[in-house]
Amino acid sequence: MSLTRLLIRDFRNIETADLALSPGFNFLVGANGSGKTSVLEAIYTLGHGRAFRSLQIGRVIRHEQEAFVLHGRLQGEERETAIGLTKDKQGDSKVRIDGTDGHKVAELAHLMPMQLITPEGFTLLNGGPKYRRAFLDWGCFHNEPGFFTAWSNLKRLLKQRNAALRQVTRYEQLRPWDKELIPLAEQISTWRAEYSGGIAADMADTCKQFLPEFSLTFSFQRGWEKETEYAEVLERNFERDRQLTYTAHGPHKADLRIRADGAPVEDTLSRGQLKLLMCALRLAQGEFLTRESGRRCLYLIDDFASELDDERRGLLASRLKATQSQVFVSAISAEHVIDMSDENSKMFTVEKGKITD
């Protein structure tokens, strides 16, 4: 699906905006602080229920307003879908799909698979394992219908188990939680392993095009020892977990380790190379989704020119065009994106929260 229309009200510094969008490239050009990133963030929030620059809702709602309102119109091959999200200062959300309330944010996420590329996105590579788990879980969410429910239940059970660890004295007292936890943990780990194995060739091929000077490898670590049953790990580590008051092993400790020429990428690659690798991984993930499901990602790229020379920008642009996906790009100057423009693209100028085309 592509987002053909976007309505924004009281989001960041944007009082109101009504944008007719291209199904191809959409460029947002303006000075720093003009509001161009806020447009990207509004789109992201419409598909995730939260912003990507701040988790504090008060910073996202426009000054002295009580709530933000976002509406979008999605065009698929066979039908159009109207979506909406309202969120107030108390954090209460209302999700509307095709005129009916009571929907979940996860439904919006399913309707709008998107990839976000920002200057802060290096955390995928040099941040903690949780960022790479999120990368894997995005793929599992869009490929496995039961993943979100299983993942939500896993989080709930781990929270309950960790609370119980502060009170129990014998492992047998934990068995009611572990009886439910173990099959969920194994299922989620299986899905992650299958996804990482399935996308490995796509990641390797795309990374080879972007970074031919390096040999990159990807290995999934499930969060506990290989060839060992999770039930055995939990029972064996009970005393240690009780001392720590949290569960030290499991799918919540999984990682996707990425190495360049045998060394961690964060120790080997420059900032420009890390950005290329991040872009390559996001592209590979979107292309894998399209091949597996026929659905296309929506790409959000903030500050397109940063860290990339002309050749690398051209390579990224050509790969994005080849996906036939909808792309939103912010830039300080139109000169940075003019080579990407064609007869189907749209150029928006953003100034002090006002958007014109």
Curated annotation (Swiss-Prot):
Its main location: cytoplasm. It is found in: Cytoplasm. Keywords: ATP-binding, Cytoplasm, DNA damage, DNA repair, DNA replication, DNA-binding, Nucleotide-binding, SOS response. The keyword Nucleotide-binding applies. GO terms for cellular component: cytoplasm. One of its GO terms (biological process) is SOS response. Gene3D superfamilies: P-loop containing nucleotide triphosphate hydrolases, RecF/RecN/SMC, N-terminal domain. ATP binds at residues 30-37. GO terms for molecular function: ATP binding; single-stranded DNA binding. The keyword ATP-binding applies. Belongs to the RecF family. PANTHER family: DNA REPLICATION AND REPAIR PROTEIN RECF (PTHR32182:SF0). HAMAP family: RecF (MF_00365). The RecF protein is involved in DNA metabolism; it is required for DNA replication and normal SOS inducibility. RecF binds preferentially to single-stranded, linear DNA. It also seems to bind ATP. NCBIfam families: recf. This is DNA replication and repair protein RecF. The gene is recF.
